[in-house]
Regions:
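C-terminal active-site "lid" helix and adjoining low-complexity regulatory extension at the edge
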Residues: 221, 235, 248-287
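Active-site nucleotide/adenylate-binding loops and adjacent lid/helix of ATP-dependent enzymes
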Residues: 2-6, 53, 78, 83-84, ...
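Conserved N-proximal alpha/beta basic substrate-recognition cap immediately N-terminal to
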Residues: 11-117
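Short hydrophobic segments within beta-strands
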Residues: 7-10, 192
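Protein kinase-like catalytic core scaffold
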Residues: 175, 197-198, 242, 254-256
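Short glycine-rich anion-binding loops that position phosphate/pyrophosphate groups of nucleotides
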Residues: 63-65, 144-145, 261
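Phosphate-binding site of ATP-dependent enzymes
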Residues: 149-237
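A short glycine-rich, hydrophobically flanked beta-strand micro-motif that places a catalytic Asp/Glu
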Residues: 177-178, 239-250
Length: 287
């Protein structure tokens, strides 16, 4: 009898979701894609949706970007799935921490992991005070988001005031992080459980180092220091499958964030390992 599992995703046609699905099918699994935004939750019999496939474990590849109320509901769905006995990788708790930049930074700091100085607030005047406190050169990020979307560097007081006042009118939360000089490059490391599997440099001609911002990949030989730092960072935010972003600075390595649904296409181009295979093998062996 074929084994069964689910992949939780915001887009079943996503290229990486398809690759991971095929890896599972090649191992004789029946795979169902669970898309939170299309799910109708029957509170009276929540198990019904899963009774036919009856998975023991599910792979989480994202719940999508949405207004706050919908995000909370989708996280609630993950909690409900775990409550009926399905183990999720990564867990609902992991997704909540890693996708919230405030919580992610806080958990890193609480675990004695070097991370840039950061202030989070709601008031525009407080945000300007934080801008000054951080030296007048900061990175302003959305509290939730990925791929570098919505990230802005503020290093001019007048421009900072305009941006902050505009966002204040839109009822946004301000996440302000000191700018770290990093020679327009950073490091991404893929962590699976207690192992750092692969890493790469991301290099750009500007301060943004996301692949979606045009950064190029370069192979990275993982040192023991980087391996240990990446694994500690993933554990700090309770994440089993993680993409850990690290910058080299004059203060040493600084962990910027931990991604709980890391992409692997770019990293695969500079790695001699089959990353989708590594991810699925970890996933299946983690039950």
């Amino acid at each position: 009898m074929k084994r069964k599992t689910i992949i939780i995703t915001s887009n079943s046609l996503d290229h990486e979701v398809q690759i991971l699905t095929n890896e599972l099918k090649n191992r004789d699994f029946i795979v169902k894609h669970f898309i939170p935004k299309r799910f109708i939750a029957n509170v009276s019999d929540f198990k019904e949706e899963f009774r036919q496939i009856n998975p023991k474990i599910g792979l989480v590849r994202g719940i999508g970007i949405a207004p706050t109320q919908k995000i909370f509901y989708r996280l609630d769905l993950l909690s409900a799935i775990e409550k009926i006995g399905i183990r999720l990788v990564n867990s609902r708790e992991s997704l909540e921490i890693a996708s919230d930049k405030f919580l992610s930074s806080l958990y890193l700091k609480m675990n004695n992991i070097a991370t840039p100085k950061t202030f989070v607030c709601e008031n525009n005047l407080d945000a300007m005070n934080a801008f000054e406190e951080l030296g007048g050169d900061v990175i302003l990020k959305p509290l939730y988001g990925s791929k570098g979307i919505g990230i802005t560097r503020l290093n001019d007081k007048g421009f900072a005031e305009n941006v902050i006042n505009t966002l204040y009118q839109l009822n946004k939360v301000f996440y302000l992080q000191e700018f770290i000089e990093h020679n327009n490059q950073d490091i991404r490391i893929l962590v699976l459980g207690d192992q750092a599997i692969a890493g790469m440099y991301r290099i750009n001609n500007c301060w943004k180092t996301n692949i979606h911002a045009g950064a190029k990949m370069k192979p990275l030989k993982l040192t023991e220091e980087l391996r240990e730092l990446a694994i500690r960072s993933a554990h700090a935010v309770k994440t089993e499958i993680a993409g850990v972003d690290i910058m080299e600075s004059n203060k040493g390595y600084q962990v910027i964030e931990v991604n709980s649904t890391p992409g692997f296409t770019a990293l695969q181009k500079v790695s001699n390992k089959n990353l989708s295979k590594e991810i699925i093998e970890y996933f299946l062996n983690s039950t």
